[in-house]
């Protein structure tokens, strides 16, 4: 399986980089995983609603440019469907069973994802009703993908 994670914003925190590197290493025996980091749109602090929309649209264009036509796209969004780790594992397994060998997860910037990215997405996933830093979501997502592979193979880890 080929998994891409497209994320807006440069990761600066060393501890997050280390955690991400660890899970990429662990995942290497299950799937080919690629993390694509795209620059965020520079914007002043107090944006109007129209300015926020423009920022999301510009970031959305960058994201859509990196998504291939043959991939199953899962957008990470606070309004997405919440799943348990086991339900998420079943979703990953079903995609593989039905011939979806490419999955792309999309993590937006601090303002979220554009409507065009949401339209392109096959599904929307939420890890919490709480707002989480988009940089932290990379690590959380990789851990859950790793956990899903372990669950699907009946390997210990997820308890």
From Swiss-Prot:
Signal peptide: none annotated. S-adenosyl-L-methionine binds at residues 76, 108, 127-132. It is found in: Cytoplasm. Keywords: Cytoplasm, Methyltransferase, rRNA processing, S-adenosyl-L-methionine, Transferase. GO terms for molecular function: rRNA (pseudouridine-N3-)-methyltransferase activity. Pfam families: SPOUT_MTase. It comes from the Bacteria. GO terms for cellular component: cytoplasm. It is an enzyme of class 2 (transferase). InterPro entries: Alpha/beta_knot_MTases, RlmH-like, tRNA_m1G_MTases_N. Specifically methylates the pseudouridine at position 1915 (m3Psi1915) in 23S rRNA. This is Ribosomal RNA large subunit methyltransferase H.
């Amino acid at each position: 399986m080929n998994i891409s994670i497209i994320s807006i914003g440069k990761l600066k925190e060393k501890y997050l980089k280390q955690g991400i590197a660890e899970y990429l290493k662990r995942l290497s025996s299950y799937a080919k995983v690629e993390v694509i980091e795209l620059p965020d749109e520079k914007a002043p602090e107090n944006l109007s609603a129209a300015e926020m929309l423009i920022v999301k649209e510009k970031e959305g264009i960058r994201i859509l440019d990196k998504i291939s036509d043959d991939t199953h796209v899962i957008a990470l969004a606070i309004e997405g469907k919440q799943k348990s780790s086991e339900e998420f594992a079943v979703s990953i397994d079903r995609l593989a069973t039905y011939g979806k060998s490419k999955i792309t997860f999309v993590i937006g910037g601090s303002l979220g994802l554009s409507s065009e990215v949401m339209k392109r997405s096959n599904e929307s996933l939420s890890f919490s009703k709480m707002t989480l830093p988009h940089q932290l979501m990379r690590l959380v997502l990789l851990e859950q993908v790793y956990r899903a592979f372990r669950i699907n193979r009946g390997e210990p880890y997820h308890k």
